[in-house]
Amino acid sequence: MMDEGSVGDVSRIDEADVAHLQFKNSEQSFKPENIEVREVKEVQVQREAGSPDCSYGVIADFLDGKNGGDHVELIGNEPCSSRQNTNDEGDVVEELTVKTCEGSSMAIVGRPSSRARLEMNRSQFLHRFPLDGDLPGSSSMSKKVIDRGTVSILRNAGKMSLPETSNGQLAIIAVNGEANEHLTNVERNPVPVEALSHEGIKTKMLSQSGFSQFFVRKTLKGKGVTFRGPPNNRSKARNMDQQTVASSGSALVIANTSAKISSSIPLAAYDGLPCLPSNTSKPSSCANPSDTHRGCGGEGLSLREWLKSERQEVNKAECMYIFRQIVDHVDCSHSQGVVLCDLRPSSFKIFKENAVKYVVSGSQRESFDSNMNKETLSQLENPLVRRRLGDTSSLSIPAKKQKSSGPSSRQWPMFQRAGGVNIQTENNDGAIQEFHFRSSQPHCSTVACPFTSVSEQLEEKWYASPEELRGDMRSASSNIYSLGILLYELLSQFQCERAREAAMSDIRHRILPPKFLSENPKEAGFCLWLLHPESSCRPSTRDILQSEVVNGIPDLYAEGLSLSIEQEDTESELLQHFLFLSQEKRQKHAGNLMEEIASVEADIEEIVKRRCAIGPPSLEEASSSSPASSVPEMRLIRNINQLESAYFAARIDAHLPEARYRLRPDRDLLRNSDNTVAEVENSETWSSDDRVGAFFDGLCKYARYSKFETRGVLRTSELNNTSNVICSLGFDRDEDYFATAGVSKKIKIYEFNSLFNESVDIHYPAIEMPNRSKLSGVCWNNYIRNYLASSDYDGIVKLWDVTTGQAISHFIEHEKRAWSVDFSEACPTKLASGSDDCSVKLWNINERNCLGTIRNIANVCCVQFSPQSSHLLAFGSSDFRTYCYDLRNLRTPWCILSGHNKAVSYAKFLDNETLVTASTDNTLKLWDLKKTTHGGLSTNACSLTFGGHTNEKNFVGLSTSDGYIACGSETNEVYAYHRSLPMPITSYKFGSIDPISGKEIEEDNNLFVSSVCWRKRSNMVVSASSNGSIKVLQLV
């Protein structure tokens, strides 16, 4: 005897090996009075509340003999509870084989997969459950049992399960007149027809069986579900699906008739029969369920949701374009012989560019085949199939209700939950026809499932055709009717869902709103054509596509596609143009590189020749120069890019020597001077046209110095005081004294050599001259040694006698602060001053009144006389420009230098033809005055831009000497440049003075260098910080 442990011995089988029920009927005719039920114990199985009556009606008809043929009844669809572990997700298949033969006995054995085990189990079962004529020792009868057909019952969740009574006994109803004679040792109780009424079904239970451990231990409950095949046909059935549905318990009723059946019919229990799929070949992509386009171009939006969205107004062109796509899809499906089952908005999704895709599964489609013969259609006359194909399903819907209503029902997750049957029938002619049934998908019916939302039920009702509501099969004309409903809903706009429901109810009676008729007269008539009550009067999809309403719809998506293609073409052309330009640029660059390489090789040869002409250096010179040469080489490598730019710029100028003579005709202003010696020196310096030689000369001067060293420090008692900011520094004619002036309202004269005396703790000025307001600038007279000019914040220009410490003259014609004052080196009696009153005034030391005034459009920040010409004056302005005037013509500037991005704070002459300017845009610019133009901006006159220091808001000082340039920085540093190269030679960082210890520390505390001044007879520069500290720095 088998116990519960035998469950583990039950092997799994796949779909191909599905168990089947085979039997051969006896020669005895089937009559209701021949039905007897052998039982050991009797159980009354009550019908559940809400169970359908149709199941019992079918059974009653069957018992009354109204339907002949083979009958296999699956009683019950109720899910059963089990003591099995419900968390087990594995599939366990248990098979019970019932063997029967004529005039013999009925035996139940185990799995037929093993012949030896089959014999052993059979003998054990017959010994435990002896039947009539099958007593121990009747081997011949046992052999007949094996040789005859077998009845195999597949225990599979969702297909069939054999329930047990409350005491664990297996319930089997045997409807076989001949088999009853072989059942012995049991009580014979015939079952009347009334026993199968709506009140209950009586069953007889076998005695204790080891197989009971394989089945549900619960009293059988449920209804009979009958399949009636056509008479005199041979039938086969096989499993079709592997999908899962809820398991249900069933009692098996086997009825044999007088007709001989050569083959067996395997059985499976269903929650409800599905729609009949198509026998035709698989349709094209437009109807193929594999091409549902889910997530294509994004998840998309359901057309139903799109219709429910708050549309401000109906875009007819957009809606008609959507409608045409759906018609195209339906036409494609109809051309493949497929009728769309769910042709309604919820079955479509709308994507970008209003592209519409059909997204329902393939089981929700039906096919129509005009070539289906009448005999095949007669198979569908079976009541069960006919009900399934109609608009209601009395079997499937209550079955689902039972699943959701039963409080104690549980499923067996280890079993598969869906099934299918493929019925092959063979007529007397030998023709074989095949029907496929699937239960893997919900039935598509006009009566919605309990799990369907109310809106979905309403949508199904709205889009169902009149013939579908009457119970007829769905056809291609039904899809046309649904298209008419869809067209009306697309072109309509509803205030609320209640208004939508009312309008959709009216359209079924062909009632259109007046607003719809007035706005869409042509579409309204077209819509009524599609909604014709008679299906034969409705158009086909081909007629719809060829109609004036649909055929004239612009292909918006195609237009968008064409625009996209045009855009791609434009982008492609643009990319091609870019690549051509890049290629041309690279080729040009390659040509320039070849020219530059040739120039470098030519210059190398020239340098080698010059060195050979000079002669080899002596051993002492070579040994002395080698250790020091490493430092300049490192600096050159660090600045190689800037050096290359300057070198090739010099090469370009060397190849255009005639450009030097394309100069303005009044360039004599640059040399108009009474200082003949200076003019001769300058002519000797610039008489050569060797620009490359000039570059090499500048490179040597740049590499000559590498750093600043401190040579002297001016120590005063007023350090770290903001009132000590020094705005201007200047050496006298002999450079023995220098003057300082600033916010302290004092002009102080210091002896230069005294700064080198380190034994002095505090340096006092040689002379000190007070002023009424803050001082902005000072300038020594280059001819009269003791004359000093100053400018202050009151706009007063004063002439001081340094010997006496008194002011000689006051020039008070400026209306605002005077920023700068300068003496002319060529004419020592002339001086000029610039002011915030946007004017430059010319003075003479022998006269009180102004000699002349230059009016400017912006504030004047600095003034500077040319060192060679007594008539050339330059000044910087806050309008980012530098102006040069011929003092013989004050009405218009001689040239305007434009290139800075901020105010020009300083302007200094390097020589009579070169000017350097400083600006608060962090740059210095070198201007070649020979390249300027008259009456316009001279943007091409800038020959070099220096950068590296910081100057954004303060006056930091500017000074020049023999081609070297010094300036301050807002980082509290002093920078040194040479005119030939744009990068700094070196810089020096000022430190702040500790007020307690008096020592210098690294912190700058937002200090900046406020003024610098070269001592031209040496490579020294005096610089001042904004805290009043003054240092003498020397380039080494």
From Swiss-Prot:
Residues in coiled coil: 587-611
Subcellular location per the Swiss-Prot or TrEMBL entry: Nucleus
Induction comment from the UniProt entry of this chain: Not induced by red, far-red or blue light.
Placement of sequence motif DWD box: 915-930
PROSITE patterns: PROTEIN_KINASE_DOM, WD_REPEATS_1, WD_REPEATS_2, WD_REPEATS_REGION
A molecular function (GO) term: protein kinase activity
Main subcellular location of this protein, as a coarse class: nucleus
The keyword Coiled coil is assigned to this record: yes
WD repeat copies, ranges: 721-760, 770-810, 813-855, 857-895, 899-937, 948-987, 1004-1036
Any GO BP: photomorphogenesis
Assigned keywords, A-Z: Coiled coil, Nucleotide-binding, Nucleus, Phytochrome signaling pathway, Repeat, Transferase, Ubl conjugation pathway, WD repeat
SUBUNIT field: Interacts with CO and COP1.
Protein name per UniProt: Protein SPA1-RELATED 2
